[in-house]
């Protein structure tokens, strides 16, 4: 509801003036009409004020790619000229390979970018108090890149509950991310 308010418009003007992005979070379940409407309002607002969009999307170990599918549908109805970045995108890895390839092609056609957050997602996803996770979803970096989707690796947490080991050290982030995501 916030994105429909006068406050949101004022915020978008301030963000645009500072060169920033508008953002939000889409986690499963996200197929409701309310989510669709709010996402479309956010996209229109960002485009009207020339602000990029950064969505934390599909940071989940279930509901494969529900947020991304919703975003792509919204972008068909509300095409934008501003960059749209999708942070996390972990649950995309739960898709069968052929479905992931088709989705990645659609993402590339929509000119989406992805920021993978492997350390945060390894810490949070598939967490259980009484068991070590046997599978942890990660953004499918190589598959997305192969389809033409730009992907960056980053960290979005510094010594907080979402990743207590975060310390703003990009070399440590890269050193841990390479084996975790098998980038080499």
Task: List the predicted regions and their residue ranges.
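Histidine/acidic residue-rich metal-binding segments in metalloenzymes
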Residues: 3-85, 91-113, 130-153
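Short secondary-structure boundary/hinge segments and terminal tails
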Residues: 33, 63-64, 124-125, 162-163
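His/Asp/Glu-enriched, well-ordered alpha-helical/loop segment
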Residues: 73-84, 120, 124, 135-184
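Short, basic, glycine/proline-bearing loop/turn elements
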Residues: 87-90, 118-128
């Amino acid at each position: 509801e916030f994105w429909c308010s006068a406050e949101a418009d004022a915020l978008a003007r301030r963000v645009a003036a500072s060169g920033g992005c508008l953002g939000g979070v889409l986690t499963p379940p996200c197929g409701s009409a309310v989510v669709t409407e709010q996402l479309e309002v956010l996209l229109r607002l960002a485009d009207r004020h020339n602000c990029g969009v950064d969505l934390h999307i599909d940071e989940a170990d279930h509901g494969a790619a529900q947020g991304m599918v919703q975003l792509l549908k919204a972008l068909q109805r509300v095409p934008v000229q501003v960059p749209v970045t999708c942070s996390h995108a972990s649950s995309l890895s739960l898709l069968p390979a052929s479905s992931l390839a088709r989705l990645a092609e659609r993402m590339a056609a929509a000119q989406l970018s992805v920021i993978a957050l492997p350390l945060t997602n390894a810490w949070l996803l598939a967490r259980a108090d009484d068991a070590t996770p046997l599978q942890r979803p990660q953004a499918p970096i190589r598959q997305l890149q192969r389809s033409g989707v730009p992907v960056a690796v980053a960290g979005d947490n510094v010594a907080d509950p979402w990743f207590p080991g975060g310390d703003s050290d990009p070399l440590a982030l890269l050193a841990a991310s390479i084996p975790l995501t098998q980038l080499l």
